[in-house]
Design a protein with these regions (language model features):
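Acetyl-CoA-dependent GNAT
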Residues: 2-8, 12-88, 94-107
Length: 107
């Protein structure tokens, strides 16, 4: 996993992250994903690998981005990358992409 400067960190996405993921997704895409899509990806799709980008702040962590890929026959298909509007233009999407590539190489 990619090492990030504080206050940021990456970790695997969980079902508990879905409400925050949907908020970033809605702010990022004209046709946002559904809750059920992410539930299925995290619980039923053995090919799917998703990560979230978190920022520590007073009062707790804030989910500021997410990304995912499918590993199919030794190749990755990047399914999504999204960063909250307040965090855009600062390399956060690049962190997410690089992390996906590192994870895929490790599988």
């Amino acid at each position: 996993m990619l090492a990030l400067p504080p206050p940021y960190r990456l970790r695997p996405m969980t079902v508990a992250d879905i409400p925050a993921v949907l908020a970033v997704d809605r702010a990022s895409f004209p046709t946002p994903a559904t809750e059920q899509l992410f539930v299925n990806e995290l619980t039923d799709n053995q090919l799917a690998h998703y990560q979230v980008l978190l920022r520590d702040a007073a009062g707790g962590e804030t989910l500021v981005g997410f990304a995912g890929f499918w590993l199919i026959a030794g190749e990755i298909h990047i399914s999504t990358i999204a960063v909250s509007p307040a965090e855009r233009g600062r390399g956060r999407g690049e962190w997410l992409l690089l992390n996906l590539l590192l994870l895929a190489c490790a599988l």
